[in-house]
Curated annotation (Swiss-Prot):
Family note: Belongs to the Hfq family.
Subunit composition and interactions: Homohexamer.
Lineage summary: Bacteria, Pseudomonadati, Pseudomonadota, Alphaproteobacteria, Hyphomicrobiales
SUPFAM superfamilies per record: Sm-like ribonucleoproteins
GO biological process: regulation of DNA-templated transcription; regulation of RNA stability; regulation of translation, ncRNA-mediated
Signal peptide (UniProt feature, chain positions): none
Name this polypeptide is given: RNA-binding protein Hfq
GO cellular component, one term: cytosol
Cross-referenced Pfam families: Hfq (PF17209)
Organism of provenance: Sinorhizobium fredii (strain NBRC 101917 / NGR234)
One GO MF term: RNA binding
Function: RNA chaperone that binds small regulatory RNA (sRNAs) and mRNAs to facilitate mRNA translational regulation in response to envelope stress, environmental stress and changes in metabolite concentrations. Also binds with high specificity to tRNAs.
Top-level taxon of origin: Bacteria
Length: 80
């Protein structure tokens, strides 16, 4: 079995980016953002919605909720 070199945060963000899954991001100040992740790095997430991009700093994010169930690992079955 190959070792997982990515951390969970990067694996999660890369999965929603590749699958173009719409998600909701809640910021620590209570603001709710929705969109699709187009890119991310160690400090920020680029979110796209209605043809506009929005750069969100990770330190401002409280919670990320995908709009559908994710399968991030090969042996993981989708929740019923």
């Amino acid at each position: 079995m190959a070792e997982r070199s990515q951390n969970l945060q990067d694996l999660f963000l890369n999965t929603v980016r590749k699958q173009k899954i719409s998600l909701t991001i809640f910021l620590i100040n209570g603001v709710k953002l929705t969109g699709v992740v187009t890119s991310f790095d160690n400090f920020c997430v680029l979110l796209r919605r209605d043809g506009h991009s929005q750069l969100v700093y990770k330190h401002a994010i409280s919670t990320i909720m995908p709009g559908q169930p994710l399968q991030m690992f090969e042996n993981e079955e989708a929740a019923s």
